[in-house]
Amino acid sequence: MADLLSLDAQMPLIANIDTGPLWGASADRGQVQRHLDTGADDGPAADWSVGHFTNPVDVQRGTGGAIVTVRDTYPALGGGIHLQPASRFAAALRRDDGREGGVLCVCDAGRAAGLERDLAARGLQVRHWDNGTPEPSSG
């Protein structure tokens, strides 16, 4: 995620995640700081486990862990912004719930080919996302 965020601050990222692995909205600043300092993973359990689109905007690194700042469309959970351990956000992105996850990188059309090369060079898979919707028949 940090690699994607470092590519271009003007390129919004939209992540398709499973919320189950995330910390719950009641995580406090002390838990966040402990994670940054020691890697402790003592945050609250997730509030729910559903497929959800979010906007990761920053990664803060500490001596023991990293925290992803995630914008969200549900202001009731974290006021529209959550602070999540990077390892939990990665698990949410993997979507171990049997569904597809991933990150949509939004850029100007003229930059798409270069972005695709940059992402592939970082070892990321670049492809169309299949949400399971059947393709329309051609006849």
Briefly describe each language-model feature range.
Residues 1-71:
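Active-site-adjacent substructure of cysteine-protease-like catalytic cores
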Residues 37-51, 58-139:
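Noncatalytic regulatory segments and standalone regulatory/sensor domains
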